[in-house]
Amino acid sequence: VGINVKCKHSGQCLKPCKDAGMRFGKCMNGKCDCTPK
């Protein structure tokens, strides 16, 4: 699930994905992509 959070590497997406109610995420094309629960 893509969210509108810019990133350079996947570690930057852990907190935004948690805040969005999802488990974890990776950085894809400069934006965070989260895994739903």
Swiss-Prot record:
Record lineage: Eukaryota, Metazoa, Ecdysozoa, Arthropoda, Chelicerata
Domain notes: Has the structural arrangement of an alpha-helix connected to antiparallel beta-sheets by disulfide bonds (CS-alpha/beta).
Record Pfam families: Toxin_2 (PF00451)
GO cellular component, one term: extracellular region
Other comments on record: Negative results: has no effect on rat Kv1.4/KCNA4, Kv1.5/KCNA5, Kv4.1/KCND1 or human Kv11.1/KCNH2 and Kv3.1/KCNC1.
Tissue: Expressed by the venom gland.
Keyword Lipid metabolism annotated: no
Keywords: Amidation, Disulfide bond, Ion channel impairing toxin, Neurotoxin, Potassium channel impairing toxin, Secreted, Toxin, Voltage-gated potassium channel impairing toxin
InterPro entries, per the entry: Scorpion_toxin-like_sf, Scorpion_toxinS_K_inh
Cysteine pairs bridged by disulfides in the record: C7-C27, C13-C32, C17-C34
Places the protein is found: Secreted
Name of the protein in its database record: Potassium channel toxin alpha-KTx 3.13
Modified residues (Lysine amide): K37
Family, similarity comment: Belongs to the short scorpion toxin superfamily. Potassium channel inhibitor family. Alpha-KTx 03 subfamily.
SUPFAM superfamilies listed in its UniProt record: Scorpion toxin-like
GO molecular function annotations of the record: potassium channel inhibitor activity; toxin activity
Role of this protein: Blocks voltage-gated potassium channels Kv1.1/KCNA1 (IC(50)=203.15 pM), Kv1.2/KCNA2 (IC(50)=8.92 nM) from rat and human Kv1.3 KCNA3/KCNA3 (IC(50)=171 pM) potently. At 2 uM, also blocks Shaker IR and has a moderate effect on rat Kv1.6/KCNA6.
